[in-house]
């Protein structure tokens, strides 16, 4: 089995330098104690070298969907992949009015950072806003508007939000509605919203299947979204938030590494740091986290020979070793950690499936189900596979590429999560 490096994060040191508020605890807060709870989050990545997107004297208006409500909130921005400072002229937050870019004026609030309305985020660092009194409900859409007065490369993004945002000229952060000059296909510089509450958060750590690939745009039908709605329907669990830290193309063991001249050079940077590398940032640092669901491994099997070199080919035992690292790190932080079985992909249009990869998937799934090393198992594979051909997705759950579940498949995955795990 190959050794698995555990790497540090430069952004943590920078966070200490600019920290304006008391940091969130890494372990769950007992129910009944006031705390900050992750209501929405996303994992940032960098962009390909060919992406020349930049903003200057423009407002970015972006929409996020909250999983749990509270009487106040705070917002996290990130300049993790910036090579220079991120200057924010003004930032505001409001509840969305309807399905477009308009906000409810009575809910409009200016964000401050250490009491300042304008702030500079150092290269490589995240930044938390001060708390703002704005009651929000679970399932609400929140609009975050950010004015960037100086030329700013769009270097820190989440590439596949399946949610439109907008860009407009000048500082129109306080406008009820804006006249867009363009549509944003990514989340830029925005990585988290937490609410004040007396509960905790569940982090979904995964790849494109968790990120929501091929689901209906703007409809919030990713399996973590559906799980959050299940929590809200349960009186004992409606205090829990769900934070989606899925990244399309993400792997357990390797960062993006497209072969020279391969088309993947134009998009692979969006796949993000390996789960082993990003675990502290995307799981342990999330506000109020008490539980984590891990669904990873399919890209470790499928990428070598497609968007990654064959030298990065891994075995089932390599994947199991990476899972064990995540389990140990979660337990060391006092978290409950649940393992998801890898879903089927026979006949996929991406070139992932082979007899060898299918055998490795089956071996990993046997270990997840039978080893007892995870605190519990969530059998996503069983939830979406075709009973007549278990190596395939059910046809009514298939988005069309035979790898990613559609909206109905996502709902089936969420229904496969036993709610008793969170009581």
Features from the language model and the residues they span:
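N-terminal secretory targeting modules
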Residues: 1-9, 14-205, 210-219, 235-236
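Conserved SGNH/GDSL esterase-like catalytic core that processes O-acyl groups on lipids
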Residues: 40, 56, 61-62, 85, ...
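Solvent-exposed loop/turn segments at secondary-structure junctions
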Residues: 81, 150-151, 208-212, 247-252, ...
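Catalytic His-Asp segment of secreted/periplasmic serine-dependent ester chemistry enzymes
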Residues: 259-263, 272, 302, 342-423
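A cross-family glycoside hydrolase active-site/sugar-binding cleft signature
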Residues: 295, 340-341
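Surface-exposed amphipathic alpha-helices with a cationic face
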Residues: 323-331
